[in-house]
Amino acid sequence: MNYLFIIDPIEQLKIKKDTSLFLMRTFLKKKLNVYFATPAGISLKETGNLSADVFKIKKITDKAMYDECEKKSLNFFKKIFIRVDPPFDANYLNLSYLLEQHKHSELINSPSAIRNFNEKLSILNFRKLIAPTLVSNSTSDIKNFIKKYKKVILKPIHDMAGNGIFLLKPNDPNINVILESMTNNGLKQIMVQKFIKEIKQGDKRIILLNGNPLPYALLRVPQRNEVRANLAKGGKGVIKKLTKRDLEIIKTIKSFLIENNLNFVGIDVIGDYLTEINVTSPTGLVEIASQANMNIEEIIINELS
């Protein structure tokens, strides 16, 4: 069977930490044929069929070894994993429209679902699971929200890995310049959430495969005096068993994920609150698999192969 991964340039991926490369290694161990392509290599022919400039992976050790580029019809692949990192910009949007034309293979995740469910905004479908949240480009509305909740987190809507996140209080001397910068002087909406104090204990990444969670979450603990727990920002990752509240959140969102063909998702949970639903290229598998006293690879094969 032939599997394709659509990824960012492979030389940009970190061999020891990247989830896409971990998935490729897992499938290679099962003697599956694994290929990769970048968005730039995807084409729609005049016949309506899609093709890609692909590279067949030979092995992944301390580096990825692969064959020369060849052009393949996407019909050649049983499953296609779309794992391009945000931001979800015009190029990503165009990729989703192109891939939506392809009906022959199973696409993980659905291109239309990736397009329709922003990783920050999709939590708004579950108001009872989230902290008080404002989405606005209005400086006055944001200031009133900050005044009400005393301490808030500001997030850009189309970014990842903790980039562009600010902690603000009503008396912050930089409040005006921060709001002007983040909203582009009132032209761009941002997300503002009540600060969740449990972030000091960490931010959990829970991987869901076909709506089913791995038995362990990756708890990312922020550095001292830091509110961003992302590993890319220096957070420390340790695995934890899922709590009763984690399972309640998963049960609530599972049917939504399945109905929208979101087969590979990473949700973020702080304390009792759902904070993000990551659908583009969820990470955390390497850290979970390396610490869990069980065969995570077998679970992945059973759910995704």
Regions inferred by a protein language model and the residue ranges of each:
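Conserved N-proximal alpha/beta basic substrate-recognition cap immediately N-terminal to
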Residues: E11-V135
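ATP-dependent carboxylate activation and anion-phosphoryl transfer catalytic cores
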Residues: I7, L13-K16, R224-N225, K241-S305
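Extreme N-terminal starter segment of soluble prokaryotic enzymes
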Residues: M1-L4
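Short glycine-enriched loops at secondary-structure junctions
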Residues: P111-R115, R220-P222, I270-Y273
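Phosphate-binding site of ATP-dependent enzymes
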Residues: S140, K147-K151, A161-L247, L257
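Short glycine-rich anion-binding loops that position phosphate/pyrophosphate groups of nucleotides
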Residues: P9, V84-P87, I157-D159, P282
